Amino acid sequence: MVKIEKNKIYLVTGGSGFLGGELIERILGAGGKVVTIARNEGQLIKLKQKYPEVDILPGDIADRFDVQQAMKGVDGVFHLAAFKHVGLAEDRCRECTKSNVIGSLNVLEEAVNNNVKFVLGISTDKAAQIAGVYGATKYVMEKLFEQFEDNYPTIKFRIVRYGNVLYSTGSVLCKWKELLKNGEQVIVTAPEATRYFWTIEQAVDLIFDCMENASDAKPYVPEMKAMSVGDLLTAMSEKYLPNGYSLDIKTIGLQPGENMHEKILEDGKYSNEVERFTIREIKEMI
């Protein structure tokens, strides 16, 4: 079992992001101290304003020196930093690999050099059914965690793997919401496609559940419900489209790196084979 200890220092890579902010709040609430490294200086400043006690370090996990500086005096690591936009990863393969593979390797090696108690990494269902660069880099990251677990048994290496988090940074939902509020046309890839979704609170809950219950570095996977892209868009239009406006959709088809249906486990069910959220449930979530 791994848990947050009072006054111990925890490194959160990518802490300026959507998931990072929620995780940092939980760590602080449990009495821990936080240092975070991220590339987005503007978001780091906002984080510092909200949580003055957090030590911020503008930097890049792909830069070994930056990781060395961030890792000093750390007791545990939450590795969130990633290049995670599926479409951009196809065009920026080098950048995606630098962040998700080289950056992860830097974090793991410096964690060993500093003898931390644990390293927990965030993966994705895209690693279970690889269709593009992003999923491939996350799969490699998972394998690195497993090898480090085998080679350095005094440190706990853990991986959580799940689907999409509602309104995460770069999510198309943020764009859809604004377009719908203005009664504008919404571009959608494939309404019949299905995806695993849940809330930011559930995502952070899984991180702590993994710390408490996972026994090795194999991906720690939750049971998740799914929704179709069409149902999600219907729920959003019912909630955000002004009265008197009709839903205007332009369908463009699946893009490079995307699957019609996702899996969380390689031998698990596709997202169109599991329990679905109802429109009402989706509206409550969004």
Name each region found by the language model.
Residues 10-30:
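N-terminal Rossmann NAD(P)H-binding glycine-rich loop of SDR-like oxidoreductase domains
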Residues 49-55, 61-98:
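NAD(P)H-binding glycine-rich loop region in Rossmannoid oxidoreductase-like domains
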Residues 40, 125, 225:
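Residues in the short beta-alpha loop(s) of Rossmann-like NAD(P)-binding domains
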Residues 79, 83-87, 91-142, 147, ...:
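Conserved Rossmann-fold NAD(P)-dependent oxidoreductase catalytic core, especially the SDR/UDP-sugar
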Residues 143-286:
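Strand-loop microenvironment adjacent to phosphate/nucleotide-handling motifs in alpha/beta enzyme folds
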Residues 38, 57-58, 98, 251:
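Conserved residues in the N-terminal Rossmann fold of short-chain dehydrogenase/reductase
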Residues 1-7:
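A short, basic/flexible loop-to-alpha-helix module at the beginning of a structural domain
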Residues 32-44:
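Conserved glycine-rich Rossmann-like NAD(P)H-binding loop of the short-chain dehydrogenase/reductase
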